Amino acid sequence: MGSFFDIGCKPYNNNIGDRGLTVGLNRTASNALEALFDEALQERHLEIHEKIMMYLPLDQISFSELSKEEFNLAIKEIQTCIHSRRESNEYQSYQRRMWEEEIEPLVQQDERYQQ
C-alpha cells in the first residue's frame, strides 16, 4: 500500500461532480515523491513542508492546507529542484517521471495554480 496524494480542488464552474484532485500511488512512487518533497522544501520552507507532510502517518500527502502563495511556492521549488539536477540517477529520474505523470497534471488543474 502506498500513499494518497490530495492536491486540492478544481475551480468551481457550476458543474455537479467531484472537484477533488487526488491520486493514490504505490509505496515505491510515494516514497520517491516524499523524498523529492523533502529535498525541495524541508531545508528552506519547513513550514510548507510540514503542512504537506502533516498527514503522512495516515499515508496521506496533502497540498490542501496550503494558501495560494504557499501552493505556488511549493510547486516552483519542486520544479526547480527537479530541473536543477545536472545528472539524474535512476531514482531521481523516477521521481521526475512520477511528478510529471501523476502529480503535475493535477497541480495544473488546481484553482490556486499560477504558471
PLM features: residue spans?
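Acidic (Asp/Glu-rich) sequence patches and key acidic residues
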Residues: 1-115
